[in-house]
Amino acid sequence: MSKTGTKITFYEDKNFQGRRYDCDCDCSDFHTYLSRCNSIRVEGGTWAVYERPDFAGYMYILPQGDYPEYQRWMGLNDRLSSCRALHLSSGGQYKIQIFEKGDFNGQMYETTEDCPSIMEQFHMREIHSCKVLDGAWIFYELPNYRGRQYLLDKKEYRKPVDWGAVSPAVQSFRRIVES
């Protein structure tokens, strides 16, 4: 475990079997150590893991816990190549403003809570811009915290490309809470 208390272990096979790769800091390319990744154990911290090297491709946020198969972290396949430890603020404050149009236009909603469905909670189809006022958040392209994930830190996002998306298809979001 690192000085910051972060550690993640990747396993080639399901249920923590086969070759493994231990990591306690950011790693831009570990696919040379493992040909595939079918299970993960996060022993400290919250991690962002990426499908491709250099923190690219699909991203998954993993808090401390066991993930015996890639479906448990909503993975699309057994390919992971890079990871980074998230350094979350310990203040415990969370606040986000979401907007129905780009550049902070249109109807605005502010919340401090997770949202499993923006359609049900805010009667919005998509999020075109947002302001993260406190905490770190994850946007999901589908309801109930499913689909592609986007990590949002404390700052303003004028359009979907600012948070790494190609479209405003965000259907749910949640706070990243350190366990």
From Swiss-Prot:
In this UniProt entry, the residues modified to N-acetylserine are S2
Which residues, by range, are in coiled-coil regions?
none
Tell me the PROSITE patterns matching this sequence: CRYSTALLIN_BETA_GAMMA
Keyword Acetylation listed? The answer is: yes
Which Gene3D superfamilies does the annotation name? Crystallins
What's the superkingdom here?
Eukaryota
Q: Which Pfam families match?
A: Crystall
Q: Where is this region: Connecting peptide?
A: 88-93
Where are the annotated segments for N-terminal arm?
A: 2-5
Xref: InterPro entries = Beta/Gamma-Crystallin (IPR050252), Beta/gamma_crystallin (IPR001064), G_crystallin-like (IPR011024)
Signal peptide start and end residues? none
Q: Which UniProt keywords apply?
A: Acetylation, Eye lens protein, Repeat
Which molecular function GO terms apply here?
structural constituent of eye lens
Q: Name one GO biological process term.
A: visual perception
Q: Which residues form the Beta/gamma crystallin 'Greek key' domain?
A: 6-44, 45-87, 94-134, 135-177
The similarity comment for this entry is: Belongs to the beta/gamma-crystallin family.
Its assembly, as annotated, is: Monomer.
Domains: what does the record tell us?
A: Has a two-domain beta-structure, folded into four very similar Greek key motifs.
Q: What does this protein do?
A: Crystallins are the dominant structural components of the vertebrate eye lens.
Q: What is this protein called?
A: Gamma-crystallin S
Please give the organism.
Oryctolagus cuniculus
Q: Per UniProt, what is the name of the gene that codes for the protein in this document?
A: CRYGS
